[in-house]
């Protein structure tokens, strides 16, 4: 019988995970007793490790007498044994400085977030482009660039701008274009996509009949809003492929797996980072959550993700704009470091976007622990 998960067995489980994360080799009882000066014999530790294996927290490769953690073991560690850590003040200052060097550039912020996550957590990283939760129209400007061509500059709240050329009749003057753009701007002021689509059928505005040209401008705005939402849904940034492939799990020389399985794991890693395959259901879950999500190995429910753990967090401004960022790596992951890195980058992105949108940032899970350092 395996017996209860006693305090000593919890300590042994924690040490096995720490040792395995550090060395990537199965952990023997003698190693734990010697390295951590445990006040019990190797035989006692061996019995406890056997009990932990019966309970489903540990397993052992057929070629080794040592044990390694299972997904269940990692889950228990994350939820019950892991010590919560923070990035050092020096790391926070360095990261914050990098972000403020590209202040106000959304795409650059997301790409930088991926780069910093990968470098700091020593694994691959992913992030979705921030998507307006309620994309709202702000203004339309028409600029004459030729007697039969104009540039439409469509501005949405939050600094999102879309530009598109459109044909115009040669008799339309710049003043005609300005007047039409002003009328459409007033008609669609602060409207969401749903409202813009409703207004697209309007025949008049404030008693003034809308011309075919003006209704065409409304249709142009509708298409721009739809295109933006579709693009935001599909756009996934990634970084850190080399960081991830440097792990022993991707080296045939480590002896952990044969070359064929290692190559297959590399192929799946490339596919995940390139297309986001396997992350599909995780993104909406993270967007709906206010905290850090940790998904370990087989918990994904997808065979392609069985060897990976994913740590994700939502970032953005509540009710305005939001995205998801996080790290991907082997289940043998330094969870405290990875979680604290994801949490800090998400809180930093919250603050940057709140400044951009001129609103008060809503603290995310664990954000208060960074408050003093961010304003140091």
UniProtKB/Swiss-Prot annotation:
Pfam family, one: HrcA
Keyword Cell inner membrane (UniProt): no
Keywords recorded for this protein, A-Z: Repressor, Stress response, Transcription, Transcription regulation
The UniProt record lists the keyword Transcription regulation: yes
GO biological process entries: negative regulation of DNA-templated transcription
Cystine crosslinks: none
SUPFAM superfamilies assigned to the protein according to its UniProt record, in alphabetical order: GAF domain-like, Winged helix' DNA-binding domain
Alphabetized Gene3D superfamilies for the sequence: 3.30.450.40, Winged helix-like DNA-binding domain superfamily/Winged helix DNA-binding domain (1.10.10.10)
Any one GO molecular-function label of the UniProt entry: DNA binding
Functional summary from the UniProt entry: Negative regulator of class I heat shock genes (grpE-dnaK-dnaJ and groELS operons). Prevents heat-shock induction of these operons.
Family assignment from sequence similarity: Belongs to the HrcA family.
Family matches, as NCBIfam families: hrcA (TIGR00331)
Protein name: Heat-inducible transcription repressor HrcA
Species: Chloroflexus aggregans (strain MD-66 / DSM 9485)
């Amino acid at each position: 019988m395996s017996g209860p998960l006693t305090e000593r067995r919890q300590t042994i489980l924690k040490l096995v995970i720490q040792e395995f994360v550090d060395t990537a080799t199965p952990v023997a009882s003698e190693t734990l007793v010697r390295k951590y000066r445990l006040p019990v014999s190797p035989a006692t530790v061996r019995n406890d490790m056997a009990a932990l294996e019966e309970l489903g927290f540990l397993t052992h490769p057929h070629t080794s007498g040592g044990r390694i953690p299972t997904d269940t073991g990692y889950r228990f560690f994350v939820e019950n044994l892991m010590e919560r850590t923070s990035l050092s003040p020096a790391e926070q200052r360095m990261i914050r400085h990098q972000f403020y060097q590209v202040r106000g550039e959304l795409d650059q912020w997301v790409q930088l977030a991926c780069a910093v996550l990968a470098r700091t957590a020593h694994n691959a990283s992913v992030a979705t482009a921030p998507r307006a939760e309620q994309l709202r129209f702000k203004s339309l400007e028409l600029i004459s660039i030729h007697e039969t061509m104009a540039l439409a500059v469509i501005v949405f709240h939050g600094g999102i701008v879309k530009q598109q050329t459109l044909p115009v009749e040669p008799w339309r003057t710049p003043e005609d274009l300005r007047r039409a753009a002003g009328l459409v701007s007033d008609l669609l002021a602060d409207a969401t996509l749903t409202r813009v689509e409703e207004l697209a059928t309007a025949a008049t505005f404030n008693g003034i009949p809308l011309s075919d040209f003006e209704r065409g401008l409304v249709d142009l705005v509708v298409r721009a809003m739809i295109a933006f939402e579709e693009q935001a849904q599909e756009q996934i940034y990634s970084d850190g492929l080399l960081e991830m492939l440097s792990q022993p799990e991707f080296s045939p020389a480590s002896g952990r797996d044969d070359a064929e399985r290692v190559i297959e794991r590399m192929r799946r890693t490339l596919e995940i980072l390139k297309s986001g395959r396997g992350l599909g259901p995780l993104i909406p879950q993270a967007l709906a959550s206010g905290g850090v999500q940790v998904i370990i190995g087989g918990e994904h429910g997808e065979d392609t993700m069985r060897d990976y753990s994913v740590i994700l967090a939502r970032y953005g401004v509540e009710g305005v704009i939001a995205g998801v960022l996080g790290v991907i790596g082997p289940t043998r992951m330094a969870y405290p470091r990875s979680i604290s890195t994801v949490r800090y980058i998400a809180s930093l992105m919250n603050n940057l976007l709140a400044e951009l949108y001129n609103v008060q940032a809503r603290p995310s899970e664990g954000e208060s622990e960074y408050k003093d350092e961010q304003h140091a």
